[in-house]
Amino acid sequence: MERIFVDKLFAAEAYTRNADKEHRAFEASKHIYDLAVISDESRISALFENEKLLAGLLSIRLTEEQNRLDGIPGVLPKDFIFFDEACSNPYIKKAYTTMQNQYVLIAKERIELDEAQTKMFALKNELMKCAAWLNAQIP
């Protein structure tokens, strides 16, 4: 679960930065939804307190980003913009509605974009308290 969470953070960032390119906004919207869903999980809350585990997962992902085709090899976690920008991006706003119509089939499991934005702000707030997040370096 913790690795999936970190992977989704990086994916949301990469796709948000390229939301104007084909299918990227749709992919960003899926990851934002997933992050909104799992952000309240106890294992994710515990990850914020486990600097060693978070640092290790970030190091692995930052290394992987160096060779990823759609990656963000020069972007440090502390510089991620998707927390603040994704839910106001016009491409992502449109794609988010489409994504929910296609993938979130149970009405009570839908998360409105405003709520997702609130959850992204809360995630950013928690991560910006973590030394592992703030001090992560590109290998």
Briefly describe each language-model feature range:
Residues M1-P139:
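Structured mid-to-C-terminal alpha-helical surface segments
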